[in-house]
Amino acid sequence: MLCLGWVFLWFVAGEKTTGFNHSACATKKLLWTYSARGAENFVLFCDLQELQEQKFSHASQLSPTQSPAHKPCSGSQKDLSDVQWYMQPRSGSPLEEISRNSPHMQSEGMLHILAPQTNSIWSYICRPRIRSPQDMACCIKTVLEVKPQRNVSCGNTAQDEQVLLLGSTGSIHCPSLSCQSDVQSPEMTWYKDGRLLPEHKKNPIEMADIYVFNQGLYVCDYTQSDNVSSWTVRAVVKVRTIGKDINVKPEILDPITDTLDVELGKPLTLPCRVQFGFQRLSKPVIKWYVKESTQEWEMSVFEEKRIQSTFKNEVIERTIFLREVTQRDLSRKFVCFAQNSIGNTTRTIRLRKKEEVVFVYILLGTALMLVGVLVAAAFLYWYWIEVVLLCRTYKNKDETLGDKKEFDAFVSYSNWSSPETDAVGSLSEEHLALNLFPEVLEDTYGYRLCLLDRDVTPGGVYADDIVSIIKKSRRGIFILSPSYLNGPRVFELQAAVNLALVDQTLKLILIKFCSFQEPESLPYLVKKALRVLPTVTWKGLKSVHASSRFWTQIRYHMPVKNSNRFMFNGLRIFLKGFSPEKDLVTQKPLEGMPKSGNDHGAQNLLLYSDQKRC
């Protein structure tokens, strides 16, 4: 279907080559004086935009009674720049379409003619590829006459290729005008790369200062006439800008060392990269030589490429290739030779057998070992308490044997709470001490605790009872809060500190139940104890479960006991401690936790009231 659509459009637009009526095309006559000394380049323009402007200007000058002529080209500027070229000999043969793979090159509306036929007249027609059927006059016909150049021996002939020196003054001459003695300074029309240069009307073009952008393809036109007709003489000159000669010897950029480590039996590529300063009349030379004892020979080049080229210098690389490095190559010398008109430079390189990379493996192994040590150290630092508890689990040592003490720990807490806290049923220090501590430390791990409100019969002397209980305990656990430090129970902490200074087996553990500020009335020893004694922080719901970090730290400070009855429970809960702490809202609460209609509501209430109290 797509092919049929193209065929239909081709017939509608009248794109058939045969029968193309070019009588309405704008006509130009050009003369090309061809020189037989070398291959010249000739250019034809297809400026349909200029034709459109000329017709529009002519139509604007008509009187109001005259009807304006139809615009010859109604397409956009982009459409008018995409043109198709045709050629026709003078004999009247049919038009021939110039394809893209023909000897004539097409670029941006220009046609480059490379192979002229002397003493011949050809017609070249161009028109847009995309046009409406009524644009029959949207075309340009150029009648080109090719003649050999006369007066070949005339002096000061302008070349079709001219060179300008950067940073200096210069001029561009029209080649066709230099040997035309019968033409006296005609008015010129100059083009550069297909664009009109309206500021230049004379020959030559004088330049006060030459820059890189001055190079390009220049076209010069001037008009000649006789009594019968007139025609345009055209010539093309290619202008190239160059810099001043750099009078320095070539510099070898690579190789930069005198030796190269290689592997025997492997292929090898040896590049020689050289920087040459610009020299107009000198050709750079790069060669590779091989020297062996008294013999020397040149090696064939595997590859040559130009790496960089500017108006000041150029970098060229020549490469040789060895299919296999042999033991004999280790005794040879490979010489890179570079030369210009100023002098030459050489670089000699020798091949050396590459040693085994034992050092690399040693370094890699050491680095891996160091990384392993650092990872192990970080693991031990983060899970040190868990590792210690694991060792205690399998260690047949019980430090409670023979110490003549009755309790593993004495728990001190505040049993006073404000009416506001009681109203919401918050998790108080008393609930933590009387419910959670027995469930975890006694029921799960087999420790024996002493709770004043549970295990001491009232009626004795309070101070004497406290001192007696602390002396019978291996540890002292103190739940700190604002009500504790500002209440009468702070005496128990003071008494324990005094006893710990005498009894080295008594160790004290502080639990920061919530944030508090030290009262000024605290004794000096108590203030100092708050700074030096180990402290474990209670974190609300995160600390409730027996596998939480809170209970792991408490067990770390508790005495070591060997109880086979509780070993399985301790190991199971201990392994949970290596995994990240989970959100305990989804876990089943301990039996000592207050129950409500649903477990989520009870635990959220505990977290909320705990934060409100502290």
From Swiss-Prot:
The lineage of its organism: Eukaryota, Metazoa, Chordata, Craniata, Vertebrata. Residues 1-19 form the signal peptide. The chain crosses the membrane at residues 357-377. It is an enzyme of class 3 (hydrolase). Its main location: membrane. Residues 378-614 are cytoplasmic. This is Interleukin-18 receptor accessory protein. Disulfide bonds join 46-126, 154-179, 174-220, 179-220, 272-336. Residues 405-558 form the TIR domain. The active site is at residue 492. Belongs to the interleukin-1 receptor family. GO terms for biological process: cell population proliferation; cellular response to hydrogen peroxide; cellular response to interleukin-18; inflammatory response; interleukin-18-mediated signaling pathway; neutrophil activation; positive regulation of natural killer cell mediated cytotoxicity; positive regulation of NF-kappaB transcription factor activity. Residues 59-78 are annotated as: Disordered. GO terms for molecular function: coreceptor activity; interleukin-1 receptor activity; interleukin-18 receptor activity; NAD+ nucleosidase activity, cyclic ADP-ribose generating. It comes from Mus musculus (Mouse). It comes from the Eukaryota. The gene is Il18rap. Residues 20-356 are extracellular. Disruption phenotype: Impaired IL-18 signaling. Within the IL18 receptor complex, does not mediate IL18-binding, but involved in IL18-dependent signal transduction, leading to NF-kappa-B and JNK activation. May play a role in IL18-mediated IFNG synthesis from T-helper 1 (Th1) cells. Its EC number is 3.2.2.6. The TIR domain mediates NAD(+) hydrolase (NADase) activity. Self-association of TIR domains is required for NADase activity.
